[in-house]
Amino acid sequence: MFGRAEPELSMIFNEILTDIHRRFGHLLHNLDLVWLDPQAFAEAIFEKGSPLRDCWGFIDGTARPICRPIRNQKIMCSGHKRTHCVKFQSLITPNGLICHLFGPLEGRRHDAFMLHESGLLQELARKMNKANGDPYVIYGDPAYPVRRHILSPFRGAQLTPAEQNFNAAMSAVCTSVEWGYGKIIKYFVFLDFSKNMKVLLQPVGKLYIVAALLVNCHTCLYGSQTTQFFAVDAPELETYLNNC
């Protein structure tokens, strides 16, 4: 193909993958992003029915299936998903972009562990506060603890009607997280082919991170289901990549 041997094509692919990750990977590792406007995002989420006026994004974890490894099978196995996998944590905003991505971690790790290891709590405490000191918050599923900058659904078997309504309203708006994951797999289908995702033989984590970066670029150019739902445009591609 293209006058090149298969091993040579693989080397070229991996070099490009590494270059993209080296040059732009920082765009997914901290919240120092010029396009990040928590007040505008919170208003957009509130207008779609959220009972929270200060919620600007949604956090969730995803487990990407991998081929059963020869080594460390127990570490890579998720008892909840009943498969071998690597896990990522992402934070998605109403303009359809993944603004923070952490991973990969071993499949046995819990979402709360990923949150602690990611350093996101420190980033939120540093960046996401109003002028009067009140916090902007993000919302996640029940796996996440309630903290100053993170909220999750009410838990328990005997919830009040108000608590049930809160959970239902937030569930309706936080589906954008699943749309974000779905778009990555839609455009990079090979990531969903677990038999070819071989830890120690392929850069499985780097593949997913670069795919997320490229999907963000696609959203900047063409929008997404999330941008249409919240009516919030993504930044220009040049603004996103240059972060200025």
Give the label of every model feature segment:
Residues M1-C244:
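Short, well-ordered secondary-structure "scaffold" segments embedded in the functional core
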